[in-house]
Structures are given as structure tokens and as C-alpha cells.
A protein has these predicted regions:
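N-proximal helix/coil linker or "cap" segments that precede and/or mark the start of modular domains
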Residues: 6, 10-33
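Structural microenvironment flanking redox-active thiols in thiol-disulfide oxidoreductases
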Residues: 66-131
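N-terminal "domain-start" segment that seeds a small globular fold
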Residues: 23-48, 68
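Terminal helix/beta-alpha structural elements that buttress the NAD(P)+-binding lobe
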Residues: 32-34, 122, 156, 184
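Proline/glycine-enriched tight loop/beta-turn segments at coil->beta junctions
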Residues: 49-54
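Thiol-/selenol-based redox modules, centered on thioredoxin-like
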Residues: 133-136, 140-184
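Conserved hydrophobic packing residues within short motifs/helices of P-loop NTPase cores
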Residues: 55-58, 88, 153
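Amphipathic alpha-helical repeat scaffolds
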Residues: 59-63
């Protein structure tokens, strides 16, 4: 096991137990960003809409090896939304042009192919150096930015980052399920 990975897992456990934050950087306002809903002109302040909930933020794409994770994300959302979990999807074309469609096309793909009901937002840049302010905050707080689609950031009810997960980590993995359960 990598030292950094072990350290992050131990800090996650301590945070869940209320013994300290995972990341020492200030996190006030991590969710305090306005963003536009996918395929709409409606703007949402994430803190106002989702503050007090457990939030799983995911950068998504329709033509990625991990696109099938939409199914697991929707299942996670359906299972836990009544207990206070929300999954927030942010399509991105940052990695190999794997999200080339318009927002209308992305919205239709998600609805028809995976019956996505969790909130989806405007196409977003997430890579370090070009990321929008929300993903810059997530990347800087976590100490890493997405390097591929379906990178996940888990935020607790207090608005603080609890952990982040590489793209290969399934939304149905024990790692994510246990962390979500502990926060709910």
C-alpha cells in the first residue's frame, strides 16, 4: 500500500469519527459556487441547493472506458438520496475528447442510456491549470485534480472534503459505499 494512500485513508477515518479534517486547508465555501444546470439557463448555487447533504462530485463523459459508471452512480443516488446523499455530475471534454457532444446531446444520452436522475451540470473544465473555480477548489483541497473522467470527490454534510477517488474506483466499491454510509 502506498504511504500517501494509507495516510489519506487514515485521515478519512479520523474525519468520519470526528477527530479531525482530512485536509488541513481552509474549506469554507467549497460548495459556494454558482453553476448552470445541464442543457438549461438555470443557475444553481451548490451550497444553497446541496449544503447539509453528503455530496459526491463526479466529472463525467459519454465516450470513456468508465462511462458505464453512470449506472453505479445512479444506483448509489437512488439508494441513498432519501438519507441525504446527492451525486452531482459535471460532463467534461478534457480527456481525449470523450465528451464531444452538445449539452442537449449529453443530457439525452444520460437519460436514455442510463436513466440518470441525479443532478447534472454544464460541461466543465476540470484539468489542473484550466479547471473552473469549483474544480480548482476541489483539486487544490484534495491535493489532486482529475486525470481522467469519473474522478470522484466526497464532501461531508459540513461542506468539507472527506476524500477523493480515482476514476477506476467504482461507485459501488466497498471503499465508497462504506464512506458514504459513515457520513449519512
Amino acid at each position: 500500500m502506498k504511504t500517501g494512500h494509507f495516510r489519506n485513508k487514515m485521515l478519512t477515518l479520523l474525519t468520519i469519527l470526528g477527530l479531525g479534517p482530512v485536509h488541513a486547508e481552509p474549506q469554507q465555501g467549497l460548495l459556494d459556487h454558482d453553476t448552470r444546470r445541464l442543457g438549461s439557463e438555470e443557475t444553481v448555487n451548490l451550497k444553497e441547493a446541496y449544503g447539509g447533504k453528503v455530496v459526491l462530485v463526479v466529472n463525467t463523459a459519454s465516450r470513456c472506458a468508465y462511462t458505464g459508471q453512470y449506472e453505479g452512480l445512479e444506483a448509489l443516488y437512488a439508494k441513498y438520496q432519501d438519507r441525504g446523499l446527492v451525486v452531482l455530475g459535471f460532463p467534461s471534454n478534457d480527456f481525449g475528447g470523450q465528451e464531444p457532444g452538445t449539452e442537449a446531446q449529453i443530457k439525452e444520452f444520460c437519460r436514455l442510456t442510463y436513466s440518470v436522475k441525479f443532478p447534472m451540470f454544464a460541461k466543465t473544465q476540470v484539468k489542473k491549470g484550466a479547471a473552473d473555480p469549483f474544480f480548482t477548489g476541489l483539486g487544490e483541497t484534495a491535493g489532486r485534480y482529475p486525470k481522467c473522467n469519473f474522478h470522484k470527490y466526497l464532501i461531508g454534510r459540513d461542506g468539507r472534503l472527506v476524500d477523493d477517488y480515482l476514476s477506476r474506483t467504482s461507485p459501488q466499491s466497498d471503499e465508497i459505499l462504506n464512506a458514504v454510509e459513515a457520513l449519512l
